[in-house]
Amino acid sequence: MSIVRQSCDCCRVRRVKCDRNRPCDRCRQRNLRCTYLQPLRKRGPKSIGESNLERAAEIQMVTVNNNIMAAPVMYKKVPKKVIDQCLRLYHDQLYVIWPMLSYDDLYKLLEENYEDCSTYWFLVSLSAATLSDLHTKIEYKKGFFFAGEQLCNLCMSSRRFFDDLSNSDIFRIMTYYCLHRCYAQFADTRTSYRLSCEAIGLIKIAGFHREETYEFLPFGEQQLIRKVYYLLLMTERYYAVYIKCVTSLDTTISPPQPEIVTDSRLSLDSFLEVIKVFTVPGKYFYDALATNSVNGSYTEDSLKRIWNELHISSLDIEPYSYGYIDYLFSRHWVRTLAWKLVLNKKDMRMNFFSNTNATHIPVEIAKDMLQDTLLTPIDLYDVHGPVIPMKALEIANALVDVVSKYDHNMKLEAWNILCDVSKFVFSLKHCNHKMFQRFSTKCQSALIDLPISRPLRLNDDSKDEVDIIP
């Protein structure tokens, strides 16, 4: 076996052939000092150093392909340190809106089940949803950041790892819910709705839509699944109004139980109140809105019951918090939707419009909403994505529908309130051009001229098609 000999230092620098003698002929001819101090360079494939691995993984995670059908690529896992920071943010600011697990439970999963595939991807998707909702990034190393969209794309390109069609455990369900929240923030309604449908489908496959499934589960597991079930129920009912798809989940499942906590960030008070707002109307209420029809079971009395039960806001919720905003706007929104059903039923509409007080209901709802916005910091709205602008715009639409029914004095009051509501709606970050154009067209058709030259904080990143949200 021949022994590999290296070129001398001078020949290697000059990039000339060396006879490898000591001294070599080329150095001797040119009176150069011939040395062999530089270490022998190993030939063949190089070993993969840890630093190279880290750098390659960072590049892959930043430039991950959005196409989930692309060829399989092995990614280095998102560091525990990054996930842990996201879990803390979720605990501090978002748990009250969409509660799943407390930080202690999430940290335990991170430490003990980091290598478990479905658990790991749930934690990554939760991190993605958290960063997307809060519009922030996490710095991992100097100059290298993790953003919600990067983590979301990483999850979407790795779906075959966490959803292999062999199981429908709660972690897979929560993963799809978190991804749905990401795309809602990206204003991609089609993808957001599709991902929520994936989660709802897994709920049914697992049998979590039947109360008897919960009987033999530990209380903590029951509580978690009930929270996720109602998160999806409310999501489905919201989309029923705007995507025009009938609902499938019903209130046959008991909501989660109130929990006694010393940390207000873990309180379920606002979440339970929002559940109440969404479930005071029955399933048929949302199906009627989805199909633009009112069946015989929906009466004037049932609509009045909704207004009466949701007329006074709860005093159990911490004011001017993320959960408080979610509850208030959901309450105003559902009352307005009940009014919308009145417009779809001719005999009921005639009865209501013959009553001045009933006709004035949209004005009263709008007044309540504007009162709630007076002392509320505007940054509390952004975490909810396009939901708050859509709910507020529903109230503005109701005002347009009835403003022509008023006499001169009432019309002037309604017009002033409509202007204030419109200014508020179009000052929100997630209010996009299409929403503004549709509403402006409706106002023009009703011969209403709003003194608004342009939206104040338009979001031009909406991926919604023209017909996705009417």
Swiss-Prot record:
It is found in: Nucleus. A motif (Nuclear localization signal) lies at residues 41-49. One of its GO terms (biological process) is regulation of DNA-templated transcription. This is Maltose fermentation regulatory protein YPR196W. It comes from Saccharomyces cerevisiae (strain ATCC 204508 / S288c). May regulate the transcription of maltase and maltose permease genes. One of its GO terms (molecular function) is sequence-specific DNA binding. Belongs to the MAL13 family. The keyword Zinc applies. Gene3D superfamilies: Zn(2)-C6 fungal-type DNA-binding domain. Residues 8-34 bind DNA. GO terms for cellular component: nucleus. Transmembrane segments: none annotated. Keywords: DNA-binding, Metal-binding, Nucleus, Transcription, Transcription regulation, Zinc. SMART domains: GAL4. InterPro entries: Carb_Metab_Trans_Reg, Maltose_ferment_reg_DNA-bd, Zn2-C6_fun-type_DNA-bd_sf, Zn2Cys6_DnaBD. The keyword Zinc applies. Its main location: nucleus.
